[in-house]
């Protein structure tokens, strides 16, 4: 006859759980449920009183570790939820919703201030929020709460209100981006080796983020010429480019920033300064109200290093393979004029500037967005220039989609003021118009003369999402500036050195457009900028991409794309056309033809691209360039410790080159730390703790990262003020590891080090028999926990227990009624057969009081008085 002990062990606790979690709410069913106790097949004198479970929705008083779901959205962490018996009717039980838990609901301020509490203000008084329903679904380890939206703050998919924002934990961050290149000339030119890098180090203390940015370069050139002037040349540089600190002000939906910064304004042109600012943080707004993140596009003729800088400070650097590229992960906090430098492996350099677009400065009705800043302008190298300045700007949502905005900026000799109006046109988008007036007093002779200059600048901007057409006009705008109009940056140059202004803006047109025609398999992308000047010729930059996906017989997902581009800088223009045709080759590979025509260099290549897995891909190209054979390869791997890119190029009769790019960082906290990959230097990250279990795969942002030997991993580049999720890939767990909790969430403030812990059990599995000192066994439903407070087994009605996470010599405790009653110690070494009834004596602890938080003791004491002594509350693990 088969042994059904294991079956009873696994199924009996769930019979109780399902009965307890049937339909708990503030509205009780009139009909009771009757149980047949013979179903449990209890032996001996074992007794369990099931009368209390006959009330539908009844939950046995005790502590339950549950995932709280509010209106079908899980909160970030699991909570210990205490159930207490009803005051008037012990057959009913209620969940204790603590003030800390209720604070996560995101209630409106007037609702939260009028809440009433019971049990010495430790539990929310039931029945006071009309329409609120609470259900316990113990089979899913969940507390399901339904709350009318009228009680809650404004929400948006994957965006949480401020009450759920997490400042993270204190710690140290050190991020870096390193690029190395070596180049050998075959025609007697110079050989060169170059290393460049930038990064951020910093400290998090509570809500404060303190950072320091660095950048460095090393270049060694060796001439292959035989003349007497040839020789080696070495250039190297290291500098700390910026010191700064900031913190979030959630109650104001604002950010306080101190130190060296770049003026980011929705109205005025930016410049470097040292000082402080308080500003409404667009990142704290719902995604549909946030600003525009810069989109940088270009074409690399060979494998190239792309550097994005602003006023001399490197803010992004990476390597890209030959062909069109787009950089879209700078974040919406980057604004102003950006300088793009593309260094090709063949030695050519492309440079151009882009002006980042800004959304119309609109605000929700009744709300105000603002910026207040003050300090002193700063040149490169921490040198302060100019007088003390101050400025402010604001946008006020009046009503019916109208917004009024304006601002002022200046010092003793320079003042500018702006006034504008914006309109939300609903289905037709949003439009804004503003006028800025500047008054400049020049005390000494300059290229502009001496005296006062007054000028105006006019701007109109438009933005629209076409959701039904799967397209978006991200930004379209026009700006006209009079000849005597000056920005703060131009005034500083004139007053400091009297230098001639070059590039005195007259008109600027800019537009970014993206559209997908899904049914036709066509996508279009356009980025266009045109500048006219009072003192030099106009400048036009554009990038147009057209792609078409189609099926060709049995070959599916064939694509053809064409890119036309023109970039101009210092009267030097780079323009041309890039054509690509690709088709699948196997499951994860493609073959392609690529042609690049223009700027005096024509090239064509046949390429092979293969994606090895989610983290790794490579590309090989063979072709001709300037009638010479060329071969290049590119390899990229998103590792747990760093992102690694490798490249190699050979151009017949001209040069051979190779490149290496590393992007990563280190995060260290009191909970532990890890090395990791990253792209956003000094940015927000999530430290994962897998209870000391190594090689646990964690998915969060991009390819999976694996926990290190200490069971820690970091998910980097997570979104600020956005509901981020990380989860364990259960299909790739190490052998003898189990995850009883595999998903965590976090909504983190900017720059935070979030911390989340997974319940992971590592070790062997065993079937054991537990016996107390008097020969009896622990009661049915007793929990076996390890020293990490993880439940590793439940006792059945015969004292049998199926254990997980078994390790030689490990200590465990057996709990019932919420108390650890006895201890067991596993043998060392473990027997070869762990499924042959391993006997584990349980040593009695004596009279041990329940260990419960002080703030919940009144609840536990009350429930204990109302529970029959022969049937103590059962502490049920939600993870079983």
Stretches with model-predicted labels:
Residues 80, 703-712, 789-800:
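Short, acidic Ser/Thr/Gly-rich low-complexity loop/linker segments typical of extracellular
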Residues 88-97, 330-335, 711-738, 750, ...:
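Short Pro-Gly-centered beta-turn/loop motif in secreted/extracellular proteins
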Residues 2-18, 28-290, 599-667, 677:
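Post-signal-peptide, soluble extracytosolic/periplasmic N-terminal scaffold domains
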Residues 165, 193-207, 231-250, 386-400, ...:
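Feature captures outer-membrane beta-barrel proteins of Gram-negative bacteria and organelles
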Residues 176-180, 212-216, 256-262, 372-376, ...:
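Transmembrane beta-barrel strands of outer-membrane/channel proteins
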Residues 60-69, 73-83, 692-702, 774-788:
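Short, ordered, surface-exposed loop/turn motifs in non-cytosolic proteins
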Residues 68, 296-298, 686-690, 764-773:
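A short, amphipathic beta-strand motif
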Residues 164-228, 368-443, 471, 610-616, ...:
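Conserved, compact domain cores that house catalytic/ligand-binding motifs in diverse enzymes
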């Amino acid at each position: 006859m088969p042994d059904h002990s294991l079956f009873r062990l696994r199924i009996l606790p769930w019979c109780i759980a399902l009965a307890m979690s049937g339909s708990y709410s503030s509205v009780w069913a009139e009909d009771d449920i009757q149980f047949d106790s013979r179903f449990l097949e209890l032996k001996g004198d074992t007794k369990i009183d099931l009368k209390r479970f006959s009330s539908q929705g009844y939950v046995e008083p005790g502590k339950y570790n549950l995932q709280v779901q509010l209106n079908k959205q899980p909160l970030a962490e699991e909570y210990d939820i205490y159930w207490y018996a009803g005051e008037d009717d012990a057959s009913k039980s209620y969940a204790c919703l603590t003030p800390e838990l209720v604070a996560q609901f995101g209630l409106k301020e007037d609702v939260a201030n009028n809440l009433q509490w019971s049990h010495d203000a430790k539990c929310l008084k039931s029945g006071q929020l009309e329409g609120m329903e609470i259900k316990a679904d113990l089979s899913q380890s969940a507390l399901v709460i339904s709350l009318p939206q009228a009680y809650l703050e404004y929400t948006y998919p994957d965006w949480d209100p401020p009450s759920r924002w997490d400042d993270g934990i204190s710690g140290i961050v050190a991020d870096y981006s390193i690029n190395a290149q070596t180049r050998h000339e075959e025609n007697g030119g110079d050989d060169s080796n170059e290393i460049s890098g930038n990064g951020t180090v910093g400290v998090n203390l509570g809500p404060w983020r303190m950072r320091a940015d660095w950048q460095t370069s090393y270049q060694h050139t060796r001439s292959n010429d035989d003349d007497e002037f040839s020789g080696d040349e070495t250039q190297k540089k290291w500098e700390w480019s910026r010191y700064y600190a900031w913190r979030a002000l959630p109650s104001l939906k604002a950010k306080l920033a101190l130190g060296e910064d770049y003026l980011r304004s929705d109205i005025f042109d930016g410049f470097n300064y040292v000082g402080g600012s308080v500003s409404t943080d667009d990142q704290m707004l719902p995604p549909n109200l946030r600003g525009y993140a810069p989109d940088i596009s270009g074409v690399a003729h060979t494998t190239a290093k792309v550097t994005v800088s602003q006023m001399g400070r490197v803010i992004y650097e990476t390597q890209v393979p030959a062909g069109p590229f787009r950089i879209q992960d700078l974040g919406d906090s980057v604004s102003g004029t950006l300088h793009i430098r593309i260094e090709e492996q063949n030695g050519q350099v492309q440079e151009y500037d882009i002006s980042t677009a800004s959304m119309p400065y609109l605000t929700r009705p009744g709300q105000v967005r603002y910026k207040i800043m003050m300090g002193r302008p700063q040149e490169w190298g921490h040198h302060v220039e100019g007088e003390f300045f101050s400025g402010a700007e604001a946008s006020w949502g009046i009503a019916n989609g109208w917004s009024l905005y304006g601002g002022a900026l200046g010092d003793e000799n320079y003042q500018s003021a702006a006034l504008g109006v914006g309109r939300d046109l609903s289905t037709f988008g949003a439009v804004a118009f503003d006028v800025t007036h500047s008054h400049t007093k020049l005390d000494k002779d300059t290229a502009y003369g001496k005296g006062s200059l007054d000028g105006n600048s006019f701007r109109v901007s438009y933005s629209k999402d076409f959701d039904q057409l799967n397209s978006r006009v991200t930004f379209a705008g026009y700006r006209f500036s009079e000849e005597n109009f000056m920005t703060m940056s131009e005034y500083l140059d004139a007053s400091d050195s009297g230098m001639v202004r070059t590039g005195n803006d007259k008109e600027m047109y800019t537009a970014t457009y993206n559209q997908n025609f899904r049914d036709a398999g066509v996508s279009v992308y356009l980025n266009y900028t045109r500048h006219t000047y009072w003192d030099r010729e106009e400048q036009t930059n554009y990038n147009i991409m057209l792609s078409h996906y189609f099926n060709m017989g049995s070959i599916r997902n064939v694509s053809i794309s064409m890119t036309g581009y023109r970039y101009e800088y210092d009267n030097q223009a780079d323009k041309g056309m890039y054509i690509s045709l690709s088709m699948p080759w196997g499951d994860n590979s493609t073959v392609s033809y690529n042609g690049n025509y223009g700027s005096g260099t024509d090239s064509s290549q046949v390429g092979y691209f293969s994606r090895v897995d989610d983290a790794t891909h490579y590309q090989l190209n063979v072709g001709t360039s300037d009638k010479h054979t060329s071969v290049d390869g590119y390899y990229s791997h998103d590792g747990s410790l760093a992102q690694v890119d490798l490249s190699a190029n050979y151009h017949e009769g001209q040069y051979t080159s190779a490149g290496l790019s590393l992007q990563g960082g280190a995060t260290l906290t009191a909970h532990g730390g890890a090395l990791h990959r990253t792209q956003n230097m000094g940015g927000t990250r999530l430290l994962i703790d897998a209870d000391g279990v190594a090689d646990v795969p964690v998915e969060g942002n991009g390819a999976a990262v694996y926990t290190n030997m200490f069971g820690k991993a970091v998910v980097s580049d997570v979104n600020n003020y956005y509901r981020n999720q990380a989860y364990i890939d259960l299909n790739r767990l190490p052998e003898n590891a189990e995850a009883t909790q595999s998903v965590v969430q976090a909504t983190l403030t900017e720059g935070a080090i979030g911390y989340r812990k997974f319940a992971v059990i590592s070790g062997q599995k065993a079937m054991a028999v537990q016996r107390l000192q008097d020969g009896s066994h622990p009661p049915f439903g007793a929990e076996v926990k390890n020293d990490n407070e993880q439940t590793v087994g439940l006792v059945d009605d015969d004292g049998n227990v199926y254990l997980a996470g078994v390790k030689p010599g490990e200590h465990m405790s057996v709990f019932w009624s919420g108390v650890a009653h006895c201890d067991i110690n596993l043998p060392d070494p473990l027997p070869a057969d762990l499924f042959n009834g391993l006997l584990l004596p349980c040593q009695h602890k004596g009279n041990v009081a329940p260990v419960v938080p002080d703030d919940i003791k009144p609840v536990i004491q009350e429930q204990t008085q109302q529970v029959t002594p022969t049937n103590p509350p059962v502490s049920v693990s939600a993870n079983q």
